[in-house]
Amino acid sequence: LGTVPTTIVPAVAGMASAQGDAELMESLSVVPAGMLVNAIFLSVWIFLPSRLEGLPLNRSLALTAMSALVVWAVVGTVAVLAIGSAQDGGASPESIAAAGIAMTGAFGLILGWSPGEAPSGSESVGASVLLARGGMAATAIGASVWVAGLGYPLVAGLASVFPAIFLTSMVALWVSQGPSVPRGAAAPMLLGGGSVGVYAIVAMTAIGDYGMAMGSVVAWAVAVVGWSLPSYAFLNWRSRAVGSND
């Protein structure tokens, strides 16, 4: 539930003020694919650390974080190019967004079906981490609005979902709790993050029908009820099922 749509709300409002309606639809169409890119980013935190166990923890953390960011940049670039090609071929923003949501959901269900060990942390998150998280999220929002104003709606859509909160969460959990906690948290975050894509596809219609403020509320409510809560129920069910078989 910690992955309900948050930073995407002001990002969409900012992008709407910086570009026209058609360009906003293009930006929103990238958001679900961007969350798939974020899911791949998080999967690096699941699979790579176990292959770096012979290294000191700080070096392992640095390599994991850098690798995840490189993967995000490469896959994000491929996604933007693919979406641009699909648009040139006549695909609608809505169909592109729906495809992104479907792929994110499938990826999340696969990794969530057999959840790994997710030990609870014993340390609270410090104020400096919260400040860093907020600062990076604000930077991502500002960057998306700026890029939208430059006339690059697809890049703006990807920038709006830069995994600032995911990155700071993974690093903070690793530093304070050890590598096993972020590994266990990544899969639930991966599936839950799909709610941002649902927000985007609903916002395509809701903002036009109800205006920015009420349309955002409608999109947020649909995303939480239609994605976040079912994802939470699914992950709880799989966790209990796997636990009962151990």
Where are the predicted features?
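Selected transmembrane alpha-helices and immediately adjacent juxtamembrane segments
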Residues: 111-155
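C-terminal ends of transmembrane helices
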Residues: 40-56, 110-122, 170-181, 228-236
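Membrane-interface helix-loop-helix junctions at boundaries between adjacent transmembrane segments
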Residues: 17-33, 40-98
